């Protein structure tokens, strides 16, 4: 299993609350429609505790393989999800993560 993480900085004209609302409704529905997606998690930075963090949040998308990830992004659902990014994101840095569990709970 592989995990793609996207580190996100919201558009400057959106409040944090508006960013969270859009991210968890419209954009999440687009992402969830991608074929082969095994797990999808969105995370938001607590701005009260970390007001100077460079990111507003990050996403985690799990796939069985790199080929499944690439197929999902190339699909019509993946293309719709990517096309939606400028509606709420200024900067998106995406990477594939190798996860090593130290403590399983």
Stretch-by-stretch model annotation:
Residues 1-105:
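Macromolecular interaction modules
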């Amino acid at each position: 299993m592989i995990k793609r993480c996207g580190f996100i900085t919201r558009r400057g004209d959106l409040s944090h609350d508006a960013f969270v609302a859009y991210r968890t409704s419209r954009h999440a529905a687009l992402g969830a429609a991608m074929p082969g997606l095994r797990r999808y998690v969105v995370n938001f930075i607590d701005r009260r505790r970390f007001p100077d963090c460079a990111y507003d949040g990050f996403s985690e998308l799990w796939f069985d393989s790199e080929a499944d990830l690439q197929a999902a992004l190339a699909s019509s659902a993946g293309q719709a999800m990517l096309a939606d990014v400028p509606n709420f994101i200024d900067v998106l840095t995406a990477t594939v993560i190798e996860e090593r569990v130290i403590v399983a709970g």
